[in-house]
Each structure stands twice: as structure tokens, then as C-alpha cells.
Swiss-Prot record:
Residues 255-282 have a biased composition (Acidic residues). One of its GO terms (molecular function) is rRNA binding. Residues 86-133, 251-282 are annotated as: Disordered. This protein binds directly and specifically to 23S rRNA. May play a role in plastid transcriptional regulation. This is Large ribosomal subunit protein uL4c. Keywords: Chloroplast, Plastid, Ribonucleoprotein, Ribosomal protein, RNA-binding, rRNA-binding, Transit peptide. Belongs to the universal ribosomal protein uL4 family. Signal peptide: none annotated. One of its GO terms (cellular component) is ribosome. It comes from Nicotiana tabacum (Common tobacco). It holds the Pfam family Ribosomal_L4. The gene is RPL4. Transmembrane segments: none annotated. Its main location: plastid.
Length: 282
């Protein structure tokens, strides 16, 4: 049986359809990455149909996102993912060493004439209740990543998942009251399986939509503020509203827009430095 490409593997990984968790895919060696998996990373404009609330196709839209080159896309996405995961670690695990554990100051029995092995403390690492050898200590696991590099990783993952993406009309006002059954019926009208992992990206989410979807364990409801790389890679289907598509095209669009933002930031910094120099001269 030939290996298949899932949504998870569409950007960086080759996965088995029987694998349900992302942890099996995080540490595959480059030798296990097929040419087909690399070829799915695209940079061209994706045309996606727009579905109505009833599931009918009412038009189409384009998703024009910047993607990393084929030879570096896997490394960019992998770096963005591992950085996010490392930055989520608290690093608060702590153990007591032999010098920190309470007690053990007195010698338990004389050095000689007991027939037993010599022992100077009851808090040796060899004894129960003793100190821990090479145990964990509080540590900062965070890793720095350039903003542009992180944005490139997200846009590459989104653009490579266009085949598993659908665009729908705004449906916030369609739910007059919270009803999970109605939301599941809506997913099926859009061709989504409630048992598959789905990611909904909306610029504005009403309370009724949140309450109707939160009991579906395979569904993630995100906004532009909570959009992250792990949830994109961990989902099998991606559902975008029309306003979310406009946001993605504006935020993760072509390189010129990114350069313009950097120039604006540089101008702001230059202006701040000029003001400081003026104040110092006065």
C-alpha cells in the first residue's frame, strides 16, 4: 500500500493515515521524506470555491500567500513549529540535590565495628529520601525567532494546505441560540466529517457559534489573534470565512507588503532616534 499525504504532511511531513497524533511526525529523519511530500509545497495562487450556509457553491476566491522555496520550506516550517513548542515549556521542574534535601547531617552509625558498609549520611542519592543526581532544575527553554521567519512558516503551511481548505460565507448570525447538533449538520453540508480534525479561522466569532462548537472535540475555532502553526499542521481540514481570507492575503501576502512593513518600522525607529538626539542636544 502506497503512503498517502495527509493535511499534516502537506507542508513538511510524510504521514500514515492511521496515525492520529502529531507527535509521531515531529522527528522523522530527512531520509524518510518523500519527493511527493516536498512537491506539495507550492507558491502559486490557489483558487478556492466559496460555499453558502446551505452548502451550495456561490463563487470562488483566491488565496495568495507567500511560500518558502522548495529546498528550504521544510526547514522553515520545522523551525517555526519547534520554536513554538519550546516557548510553551514552563521550565519549572525542580529537584533537590544531596546538599539541598532536608536532614542527613548526622552520621547514621559508626564508621567501624558494625560490619556494615560505611555511610556518612542518610540523604545520599543511593537511599530513599536522598537527593537526586543530575535532576531537572528551572530552565529557560525559550528560543528566539525572527518575526518574518515565523510569518513565513505560517504562510507556507497555509498555502500548502489549500487542497484541504474550504471558504464559507459568514455564518455568525445564522445561530439564534447555541445548538451543537445544528453545527454538526452544518459541517456535513460543507463536506466535513465531525470525526476529523477541523480548524475554523474567523475574524469575528459570536457567542452562539462558540457555544455550539466547543463540545466538538475535533474542532478548533481560532481568530487571527490565536492563529498558530501547530494547529494548522495538526488539522486535516481548514475552514476559512471570506473575511479570514482577506486577512490572510493582507497579513501573509507577497513579499512587497512585508518589506513595506519593515520600512515603516525602520522609519518609526529612525524618527524615535531623531527625537532622542534632538532632546539630548537641547
Amino acid at each position: 500500500m502506497a503512503a498517502s499525504l495527509s493535511f499534516f504532511s502537506s507542508s513538511i511531513f510524510l504521514s500514515n493515515p492511521n496515525i492520529q497524533s502529531s507527535k509521531h511526525l515531529l522527528f522523522r529523519s530527512p531520509k524518510q521524506l518523500s519527493v511527493a511530500a516536498i512537491a506539495t509545497i507550492r507558491s502559486e495562487v490557489a483558487t478556492i470555491p466559496i460555499l453558502s450556509f446551505d452548502g451550495a457553491e456561490v463563487g470562488s476566491t483566491t488565496l495568495n500567500l507567500k511560500s518558502a522555496p522548495l529546498d528550504t520550506a521544510r526547514a522553515v516550517v520545522h523551525r517555526g513549529l519547534t520554536t513554538d513548542l519550546r516557548n510553551q515549556r514552563r521550565g519549572t521542574a525542580s529537584t533537590l540535590t544531596r546538599s539541598e534535601v532536608r536532614g542527613g547531617g548526622i552520621k547514621p552509625y559508626p564508621q567501624k565495628k558494625t560490619g556494615r558498609a560505611r555511610r556518612g549520611s542518610n540523604r545520599t542519592p543511593l537511599r530513599p529520601g536522598g537527593g537526586v543526581v543530575f535532576g531537572p532544575k528551572p530552565k529557560d527553554w525559550s528560543v528566539k525567532i525572527n518575526k518574518k521567519e515565523k510569518r513565513l512558516a505560517i504562510s507556507t503551511a497555509l498555502s500548502s494546505a489549500s487542497e484541504n481548505t474550504i471558504v464559507v460565507e459568514e455564518f455568525n448570525d445564522k445561530f439564534e441560540k447555541p445548538k451543537t447538533k445544528e453545527f454538526i449538520d452544518l459541517m456535513r453540508r460543507w463536506g466535513l466529517d465531525p470525526k476529523e480534525k477541523s480548524l475554523f479561522l474567523m475574524t469575528d466569532v459570536s457567542d452562539n457559534v462558540i457555544l455550539s462548537s466547543r463540545n466538538i472535540g475535533t474542532l478548533k475555532m481560532l481568530t487571527p489573534r490565536t492563529l498558530n502553526l501547530f494547529d494548522i499542521l495538526d488539522s486535516e481540514k481548514l475552514v476559512l470565512t471570506k473575511s479570514a481570507v482577506d486577512f490572510l492575503n493582507e497579513r501573509y501576502g507577497d513579499e512587497n507588503e512585508w518589506e513595506d512593513e519593515e520600512e515603516d518600522d525602520q522609519e518609526d525607529n529612525d524618527g524615535g532616534e531623531a527625537e532622542e538626539s534632538t532632546e539630548s542636544s537641547e
